[in-house]
């Protein structure tokens, strides 16, 4: 009985560890994820900095740092019409949140806060 409980505990621990891993590829993507992706900062109701550059063809981790007390997210779209989403991050009231973005083809992409549509930026995949 002790062996069964020990085995069950180990399987449960392994499942929890796998579920919490930030290196998993997003749905519809395969391959490794670059954990050293860009950081996007929300401060004073805008995104800080200029265009964000990423390596084309590689899944990457987008590090979001919400320094406002207002809720924000980072939603990546193919263009400024925001009609075709590439990755939609979780809304964060304050603090940091990582999201994995599937590999982008070379080109320019649009991102915004889906809560505050006037908060926008550009991602360039090279």
Q: How would you label these PLM feature ranges?
A:
Residues 2-9, 13-16, 20-126:
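Extracytoplasmic copper-binding redox domains, predominantly the cupredoxin/blue-copper superfamily
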């Amino acid at each position: 009985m002790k062996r069964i409980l020990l085995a069950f505990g180990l399987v449960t621990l392994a499942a929890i560890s796998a579920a919490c891993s930030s290196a998993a590829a997003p749905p519809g993507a395969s391959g490794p994820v670059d954990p050293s992706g860009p950081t996007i900062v929300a401060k004073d109701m805008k995104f800080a900095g200029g265009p964000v550059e990423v390596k084309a063809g590689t899944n990457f981790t987008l590090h979001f740092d919400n320094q406002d007390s207002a809720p924000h997210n980072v939603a990546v779209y193919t263009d400024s019409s925001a009609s075709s989403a590439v990755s939609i991050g979780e809304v964060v009231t304050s603090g940091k949140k990582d999201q994995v973005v599937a590999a982008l083809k070379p080109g320019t992409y649009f991102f915004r806060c889906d809560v505050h549509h006037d908060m926008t930026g550009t991602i360039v995949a090279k």
